């Protein structure tokens, strides 16, 4: 039987989670959290994020030695070797920064904590990952088309979109990594957060709205405003603005519209700010 590469040790049960198990779990969660166009990229980032834990130094550290070992940059190097730019760059920022935050880009000969500076460092051999983890093939052309969509020939828009998607991928990766780590390392079984049932939520909203009396002129006006908002929300658009006065029921009306749109467009989540 080959060497066991440990990612985490549960201090309560003394059980170990292998690097392979953690990377595969993180990859699946990262894909689950991502929008459809980013799922494959998110999966690859999750698969590669802890490749550096295959270093001998990290394995000595996880087994009790009081030494410091940098591991996150190794995954960034690995995706840089596997995938072309700018796809690999997006993953590199996220993987290198998944413990400390997205680093500055830096320049070719840097020796600081920028992405370039960190990737210029020398690390122990971590090629053992190739025996346990297979980084997936990605559809480069499809991803490039998604990145360029809606940007036209405007370079600033393209840069802004790349920056936004990098931060989005970073959020997916950090959430996936911390969720899997927490679930393994806690003393009791963790109940995964529930997935909202938008159909049932909409039913409850409708029951509550139907329970309101519509007798006074104010109540009738409020009902008319809400119905107008519901009708207009069926028109196809990317952004909707609800301009209703205080006390007219914007909170419930906006919640109902969001649920209706989420169901109709098969969205996975609603973000309420």
Q: What feature does the model see in each segment?
A:
Residues 257-273:
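Conserved SF1/SF2 helicase motif Ia
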Residues 1-204:
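Accessory nucleic-acid engagement/destabilization modules that flank
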Residues 33, 232, 261-262:
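Hydrophobic helix-cap positions at the C-terminus of alpha-helices
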Residues 29, 228, 257-258:
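Short, hydrophobic/aromatic alpha-helical segments in well-folded domains
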Residues 22, 208-243:
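Conserved pre-motif I regulatory segment
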Residues 41, 239-241, 269-271:
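Residue-level preference for the first positions of well-ordered beta-strands
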Residues 18-23, 67-72, 218-225, 247-251:
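Phosphate/oxyanion-binding active-site loops and adjacent basic polyanion-contact surfaces
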Residues 235-260:
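Walker A/P-loop
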